[in-house]
């Protein structure tokens, strides 16, 4: 069977929530953060600037917030089945996220996902500082990681799959052999070769095997 690589976004794709919005709720600024998130995902705001603005609002949160936030996360219907199905075929699965390793790593472990790229939040003396600890994961970063993982796995780009919902997923969706907009924002839907409008990630397998 042909070796393949599936790369997905996390927030609103692999899971039903936007982790940064959940963190915003913990900080008492949930609505403000959610409004910025929605505009950023629609491509109406510069993603880097929008992320920095939202992270600033999280300053002062205790690092215990990561575990609490993870307990509120639910996987999208079909997500775990898609990962298991891919692994049963010998395929690899990775996630690329503008979210945060502090929660993403727990999600990845629970879903048995092979690779993960995400942002790191700066924590000093057990508290979030409101800053990021490393370079921001951008739409360009997501694309580059897809390309790097494909090379590392020995998978031809024609046999890669990219799935996402936001404007920052468009470059990887367009570069992959099979690019899927999943319950996506209008700008992403228009840019994607394939779309799924039902919250069932196993529908992606039908597209992959048909393509």
Give the predicted meaning of each segment.
Residues 1-121, 125, 199:
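Alpha-helical substrate-recognition element adjacent to the catalytic core
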Residues 70-211:
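C-terminal cap/substrate-recognition subdomain and adjoining C-terminal extension
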